[in-house]
């Protein structure tokens, strides 16, 4: 039942409302930059809601957050509105940005540094594996073919494509990519893993005092899809034969953050969990043919080269790979590819999670499906 603010006779009673959003982030090649922009707007809205609710003074440095604050203040006399994002499910590019947004919501951390991550580090020349990167005379027969393609684009396609074809940068990077290693993934898996670790680290450490954009007692659940290349055995009940054995390749990595009413934090999104979050980001975005399949040994090697520890490694394995462990499989042999291969739009995960939420005031529940259309 909706709770109402006390009011004197004759005054209009202020409505108390919680807008809860479950985000479903679509997976697709090259959508990471667009998803990042959406994530920043969602973070600005949630932060503006907390600012108005808690009557925090001072203008925000974010122009969009200031606009959201102004809007919420305008309606505050009639509606005491709190915006909460409590469920995020994502695949591939959506999975990466869902991970980053979840940690930002859990500990009230910034996402501004990720602009550089996507615009500068998310570059063909940066992602190419140095071992297979084209040299000056690699595949020289490709050069006249690329020149012909550029001429055809300028002649046959629209203005936007024509402008892109004339771009020296586009032509140089296309040449570099097509002349690099064939018949093996051209991009470096370890480079991508380092990017994910750097992206999470650039958000900053956990705050010394509890600080979160989640209301006390309200959990934030994150679901990231990936594809287990080898899969695990499972029984399927039929009529004749009564039971068959098949292999399940869909795999979900889940994380939860909860701050109790007395201030204690039970979170799987802390600074100590960064390697596990980076694991999920690398696995869900391991696009077949572009990146090599991801294995836990790759994460171990990158962390070792950096002199970093992973204290929660075994805890993460025990929690996330129960089916493999129950069948005696070695997690080191498991290989993961892009979550979009089998579960590109994880709406079912968000809908199922919504069913277990409680409320102590009026709630307007929305499931928001994010599919950028560049």
Regions found by a protein language model. Give the residues of each.
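Extended, Lys/Arg-enriched charged tracts that mediate electrostatic binding to polyanionic substrates
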Residues: 187-214, 218-221, 229-231, 343-345
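A short, charged/proline- and glycine-enriched loop
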Residues: 15-21, 82-84, 219, 330, ...
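Flexible, membrane-associating and regulatory peripheral segments of lipid-active enzymes
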Residues: 1-23, 44, 86, 138-146
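Patatin-like phospholipase
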Residues: 32-199, 236-248
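Catalytic or ion-translocation cores adjacent to nucleophile or general acid/base/metal-coordination motifs
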Residues: 111-129, 345, 352, 359-374
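Active-site-adjacent bridging/hinge elements
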Residues: 7-18, 64-77, 165-170, 306-329
């Amino acid at each position: 039942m909706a709770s109402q603010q006390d009011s004197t006779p004759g005054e209009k009673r202020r409505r108390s409302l919680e807008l809860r959003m479950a985000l479903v982030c679509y997976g697709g090649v090259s959508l990471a930059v667009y998803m990042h922009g959406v994530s920043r707007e969602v973070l600005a809205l949630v932060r503006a809601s907390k600012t108005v609710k808690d009557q925090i003074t001072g203008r925000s440095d974010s122009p969009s957050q200031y606009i959201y604050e102004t809007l919420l203040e305008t309606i505050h006399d009639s509606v005491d509105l709190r915006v909460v994002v409590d469920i995020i499910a994502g695949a591939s590019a959506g999975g990466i940005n869902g991970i980053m947004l979840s940690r930002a919501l859990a500990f009230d951390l910034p996402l501004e540094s990720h602009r550089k991550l996507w615009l500068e580090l998310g570059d063909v020349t940066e992602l190419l594996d140095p071992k297979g990167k084209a040299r000056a005379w690699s595949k020289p027969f490709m050069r006249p073919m690329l020149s012909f393609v550029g001429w055809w684009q300028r002649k046959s396609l629209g203005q936007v494509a024509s402008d892109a074809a004339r771009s020296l940068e586009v032509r140089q990077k296309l040449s570099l990519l097509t002349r690099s290693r064939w018949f093996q993934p051209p991009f470096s898996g370890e480079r991508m893993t380092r990017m994910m670790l750097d992206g999470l680290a650039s958000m900053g450490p956990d705050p010394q005092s509890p600080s979160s954009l989640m209301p006390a007692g309200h959990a934030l659940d994150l679901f990231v899809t990936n594809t287990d290349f080898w899969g695990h055995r499972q029984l399927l009940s039929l009529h004749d034969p009564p039971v068959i054995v098949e292999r399940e390749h869909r795999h979900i990595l889940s994380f939860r953050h909860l701050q109790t009413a007395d201030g204690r934090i039970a979170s799987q999104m802390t600074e100590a969990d960064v390697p596990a979050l980076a694991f999920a980001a690398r696995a869900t975005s391991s696009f077949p043919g572009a990146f090599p399949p991801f294995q836990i040994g790759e994460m171990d090697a990158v962390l070792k080269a950096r002199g970093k520890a992973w204290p929660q490694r075994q805890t993460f394995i025990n929690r996330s790979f129960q089916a493999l462990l129950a069948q005696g499989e070695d997690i080191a042999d498991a290989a993961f590819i892009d979550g979009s291969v089998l579960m590109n739009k994880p709406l079912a995960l968000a809908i199922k999670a919504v069913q277990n939420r409680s409320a102590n005031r009026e709630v307007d529940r929305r499931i928001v499906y994010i599919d950028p259309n560049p």
